[in-house]
Amino acid sequence: MNPILINRLQRKLGYTFQQYELLLQALTHRSASSKHNERLEFLGDSILSFVIANALYHRFPKVDEGDMSRMRATLVRGNTLAEIAREFELGECLRLGPGELKSGGFRRESILADTVEALIGGIFLDSDIQTIERLILNWYQTRLDEISPGDKQKDPKTRLQEFLQGRHLPLPTYLVVQVRGEAHDQEFTIHCQVSGFSESVIGTGSSRRKAEQAAAEQALKKLELE
């Protein structure tokens, strides 16, 4: 690994690993090595969910469980994590196999998002829960300050459906047009057709559901509702 890139990443994270092998594992996709980051990702996913849930619970003492769940989903969803990964310039540090490198895996939202979760798991194992909680809250500070309860926290498919139903328009249709990759690491491409659009909008994701949500989000942006 390029030490300049690794040092830059650790500065952006606000954390220097004591166990360098944990950092390397967190950055390693399963296409590159059998010692990959999926177990760290599993751990990091749970830690992130806890930290964000705890922050929302204390920030919004009068908000009900439904709104808090929707806010948490917005903050921990794949495209939010991919945005954070790009802020860290994480793509340049990924360890990918030849196939993933050739297909542009360092830009794929699902890989970027999974790696952020793996880094969270790695930092926790390298330090303690207080340290990773402090870091996550720092990474999310602006997003936590800007988020608020309400309809905007409903998932994109629900919001698009409610918008169209409110105007007595047909519901959108979602069509899988491509599935790339092996069974354990697929990328779905969905075309979403919305009444009034001359062309379908496109969404991609690591599952059909995530790709449909991404397509719905693009439709909302086209309708200037996002």
UniProtKB/Swiss-Prot annotation:
SUPFAM superfamilies in UniProt: dsRNA-binding domain-like, RNase III domain-like
Gene Ontology annotations of biological process type: mRNA processing; regulation of gene expression; rRNA processing; tRNA processing
Organism whose genome encodes this protein: Pectobacterium carotovorum subsp. carotovorum (strain PC1)
Protein name: Ribonuclease 3
PROSITE patterns given in the database record: DS_RBD, RNASE_3_1, RNASE_3_2
Domain DRBM: 155-225
Main location, first listed in the record: cytoplasm
Cofactor(s) the protein needs: Mg(2+)
The entry's keywords: Cytoplasm, Endonuclease, Hydrolase, Magnesium, Metal-binding, mRNA processing, Nuclease, RNA-binding, rRNA processing, rRNA-binding, tRNA processing
Quaternary data: Homodimer.
Stated role: Digests double-stranded RNA. Involved in the processing of primary rRNA transcript to yield the immediate precursors to the large and small rRNAs (23S and 16S). Processes some mRNAs, and tRNAs when they are encoded in the rRNA operon. Processes pre-crRNA and tracrRNA of type II CRISPR loci if present in the organism.
Family statement: Belongs to the ribonuclease III family.
Record localization: Cytoplasm
